[in-house]
Every structure is written in structure tokens, then in C-alpha cells.
Regions:
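Eukaryotic helix-grip
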Residues: 26-301
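N-terminal secretory signal peptides that target proteins for export/translocation
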Residues: 1-5
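Bacterial N-terminal signal peptides
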Residues: 10-20
Length: 301
């Protein structure tokens, strides 16, 4: 290893250690950032309400042209998790707002041979969520329940060059549309970054005065029992800090990749928990041609 390489590695390590330390990496969540996030959420939830009320586009694949829908459904039946960005604008980092970034991703998976009631029983078992969603969920606890409304605690672990741990709480509400469809809305009510986790020095950083890797996390799940199984769709909208000048190479992978990876991982873990014997499909399987004749013969409600 050459001297220049050693110097570059040393400089990179120093930057990582410096950024992860307090207070060097700290940023502050501003009121105007919260206002813009809340405005985006209001617009997004209005869009979601319209799709539920229309009864025509419950899942994102319902809005596709027939040929495209057939192709996507064939991928789902091979066990793939389909994911896409819903963000607008040209930035690959997310939607720029004052003092932060909004990330909006949607994913869907199909799980054969299960029922809607079976699915809801698993996703509502919050005391055991850490067992199903490890390693990203390290701890979980149902704080309270009143009918279809839940208060939940999750300790989250995010790793992408940097590893960050968060203690988070959510208000979650489930709604039954009919005998085959349901949806839920989950709003984070408290997110605190944990410093020195699982050590005697463990403590929470002041809320909104941390590395800024996760300030808000709202998720919207939809469940539809049809075609001999259940489609599960989730849209996740999160708020993070903006990319700090000069440290894009370090911070951008975390802020840019974690939202989509976490969502895809959550749906894959849900599928595995519901039907453990189903093998995972690698990305190489995406090159296989679907059975279009069989898929075209199927008509969704």
C-alpha cells in the first residue's frame, strides 16, 4: 500500500470519526423545516384519501397500463419486492426543503397462500417486531392499544458507512375498507438519536439536535387479499438533514440509500415472517421473462 493511499485512508477515517463525534456533526431541526414537511404530508395524505375513495386504484400497480401491470405482477409472483421513488424534482438526494430533505418511497410485495387476517395479526404484533425485522429493528414494544389504534416503541439501527441508532415512537391507526382490504397510517411522534448505544455511556442526544439522519418517519401500509394471497404495499416518507458541504461523499450514501433500503428490507422481512419457506429471489431473476399468457388470463377486482 502506497504512502498516498495510506494518507487518503487516514484522512477518510479521520473525517468519519470527526463527523460521528459530538458536537462536530450536530445540526438543528428548524421550525420552517417541520412546516414544509407537514405541508408535504398534508398533500400526500390527501392524494392517498382520494385513491381509497375512488375504489379503483388501491395499489400502485392498479394504475398501470395492462401490459405494464402484467409484467409487474409477474415479478411480484416470483417473489420480488418492487420499489420506486415518488419524489418530484431532479435531485437524487430527495426533495429539498428549507434545512432538510424529504424522502418518499413506495414498495409492494405479493405473498401467496395467506389471508388478510393472518397478515394483520403479524404486522400488529409489535411486541415481537424485533424478531421479524432484525437487524434494523433492535427492540420493540407495544406501549398501548385502543381498538385499531396503537402506540409503539422501536429501536432502529441504520448502517451505511456510518451506523446510527434511534429510539422512536409512533401512533398507528388501522382501517378496514372491506373484507379483503385494509390500510394503516403510522406517524412518528418521537425520534431521538442514541449516542454510545449498548454501553454504560449510552444516552439520547437532544431531540432535533443530532446528526440529522432521521427527524421524521411516516409510513402508509395497504393490504389487499386477492389472487390466492395478499398484496402488501408501503409508502414511507422521511425527513433528514440536507447534505453538508464538503462531506457529501460520507453523508450522501447514508441519507440517499437508507430510505429505500430500509423499506425494501421491511417488506422482504414481512414476506419471510408470513411464509418462512418461500425462498428469496435475487436481482438476477429480474431478467427472466414472465409467463405473460398466464398473467393476462388473470383479472384483478
Amino acid at each position: 500500500m502506497g504512502r498516498k493511499t495510506i494518507i487518503r485512508l487516514g484522512a477518510g477515517l479521520l473525517a468519519v470519526l470527526s463527523f460521528a463525534s459530538e458536537p462536530a456533526a450536530a445540526t438543528k431541526l428548524q421550525p420552517e423545516t417541520i412546516e414544509e414537511f407537514d405541508r408535504y404530508i398534508g398533500s400526500s395524505e390527501s392524494r392517498m384519501d382520494e385513491t381509497v375513495a375512488s375504489q379503483r386504484v388501491f395499489l400502485w400497480i392498479d394504475s398501470l397500463a395492462e401490459h405494464d401491470r402484467v409484467l409487474e405482477e409477474a415479478k411480484l409472483r416470483r417473489g420480488q419486492v418492487l420499489i420506486r421513488r415518488l419524489e418530484t424534482g431532479n435531485s437524487v438526494d430527495g426533495i429539498h426543503v428549507r434545512g432538510g430533505l424529504i424522502h418518499d418511497w413506495m414498495a409492494i410485495v405479493f405473498i401467496p397462500g395467506i389471508s388478510l387476517s393472518h397478515t394483520l395479526a403479524l404486522v400488529q404484533d409489535y411486541d415481537h417486531a424485533a424478531e421479524h425485522y432484525s437487524p434494523e429493528v433492535e427492540r420493540s414494544k407495544l406501549l398501548s392499544r385502543s381498538g385499531n389504534e396503537f402506540r409503539v416503541f422501536l429501536r432502529l439501527k441504520r448502517t451505511e458507512m456510518l451506523t446510527t441508532v434511534f429510539d422512536t415512537e409512533y401512533d398507528i391507526r388501522y382501517v378496514t375498507v372491506d373484507t379483503s382490504r385494509a390500510y394503516s397510517r403510522s406517524h412518528s411522534t418521537r425520534i431521538s438519536e442514541v449516542a454510545d448505544p449498548d454501553t454504560p455511556r449510552e444516552h439520547e442526544k437532544p431531540i432535533g439536535e443530532d446528526n440529522g439522519f432521521l427527524w421524521r418517519l411516516y409510513s402508509y401500509w395497504r393490504f389487499e387479499q386477492v389472487d390466492g394471497g395478499v398484496y402488501i404495499q408501503c409508502e414511507a416518507i422521511s425527513l433528514t438533514r440536507d447534505i453538508p458541504p464538503g462531506l457529501g461523499w460520507l453523508v450522501r450514501p447514508f441519507i440517499q440509500n437508507i430510505p429505500s433500503k430500509s423499506l425494501s428490507s421491511a417488506l422482504a422481512a414481512t414476506r419471510k415472517a408470513l411464509v418462512p419457506e418461500i425462498p428469496r429471489v435475487s436481482s438476477l431473476d429480474q431478467r427472466q421473462e414472465p409467463d405473460l399468457a398466464a398473467a393476462m388470463a388473470r383479472t384483478r377486482n
